[in-house]
Every structure is written in C-alpha cells, then in structure tokens.
Amino acid sequence: MARRSDHSHEEIRDMVLAAAEHIIVEQGHDGLTARKVASEIGYTVGTLYLVFENLDDLIMHINARTLNRLHQLMTDGETQNLAPEDRLMQLGQIYIHFAYSDPHCWALIFEHRPTDDRPMPDWYAEKVMRVFVIVEETLQPLAPHRTESEISQAACALWAGIHGICILGITQKLGDVGEDSVQNLAKSLIVNYLSGFANYQNQPMMNKHI
C-alpha cells in the first residue's frame, strides 16, 4: 500500500480520476465504487475523500472530463471551417460517434443521480452549456430572423432529437442497428428540422407545425 506522501494531492486526484474512468469503461458505471478505485491506485478509501468530497463529487468530475473531451472534438478546427449546415451535420456525427466510442462514460453524464439535492455547481453547468452554445452559434446564421430564445430552443430541440436517437440505437431499442444506421437517422432529423427552422419566418416557433 502506497503512503500518502508518495504522491502530491494533485497527483492522487489525477490517479483517482484515471482509475475511476478505467473502471467505468471496463465495468460500466454500476461497477464504480470507492473501494475499487482505492484498490486500483494502491491507497485507502479514506485517501479518496481527501481529494473528493464523496462518490457523487468524484462522478461529477469524471463527467466534467467527459464533457471536456466532447467539447474539444466539437470545436476541432476542421468543423469550424465548414458551412453552417455541414457543421451541424458534422457535430451530430461527432456526438453519436463519441457516444458509441465511450458509451459508459457518455451514459454516466445523464444517468447518474446525486444522493443529495444540492444544485449543480456553476463550473459544471458552464461545461454543459458550452456544448449547447456551439450548436446555437452554428444555427444563428441559418435563420438570422430568429430571436435569441428561438435559437436556444432550436439548439435544445436538435440536441434532444439526436440524443434520443443515440440512446435508442445504443440500447438496441431500434432493433439490431449499428452506428451507421443511427448516423443516417440523425442526418434525416437535422435536414428536415433545418428546412422548417430556416424557412418559417413569420410566426413564433411555438405556433409552427414543422
């Protein structure tokens, strides 16, 4: 068993996060326990709680790292040079491929429920929102007549649709389909949604039948 002095506070923190992510990838998030993490890094369970408040806090930081990786992929230089329609298609493809490549860490963002009722910290909420901001910024040039709130609503609607297709595909609720089929469904959703979103100009979105 390693001594606490063998590693700095930050080193232990990074070791815990890496070990926890490895367990999630191998066993799913249901397999994650403080005891397993401690065993993997060679420290006591008590050491984990010197760097994280509790298991919920650890999971939130794991989710933050997952969101960071997703954000980095979505802001890759290649996507920023595309036309808005093409960029939205690419963003959808990136999201679905990310989910299929790392399904357990991806699912943990949405499936974990903290044991207390404390609100989401601002630093974590910012990581969630900046993913939506990318979609909002890409949508805006396609419909300059839309208000800021309509753009935000559209970004949420598109994400919800793509996310739903992704969940149904990964959990095999669409039958025995693979990532390619899910990608095609997402493309169809984006094409049809954008057609209505860009062309209906004279009425508020809530009154549209797109």
Segments (PLM) and residue ranges:
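Amphipathic alpha-helical linker/stalk segments
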Residues: 64-88, 120, 129-131, 137-141
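Amphipathic C-terminal alpha-helical segment
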Residues: 158-177, 192-203
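Amphipathic alpha-helical packing segments from all-alpha helical-bundle domains
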Residues: 118-144, 152-156, 184-195
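Amphipathic alpha-helical segments used for helix-helix packing
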Residues: 101-119, 167-175
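Generic hydrophobic, amphipathic alpha-helix propensity
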Residues: 12-20, 37, 62-66, 70, ...
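Hydrophobic alpha-helical connector segments
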Residues: 75-104, 129, 145-148, 154-158
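Helix-turn-helix
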Residues: 15, 23-57, 61
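N-terminal intrinsically disordered/low-complexity leader segments
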Residues: 1-11, 81, 201-210
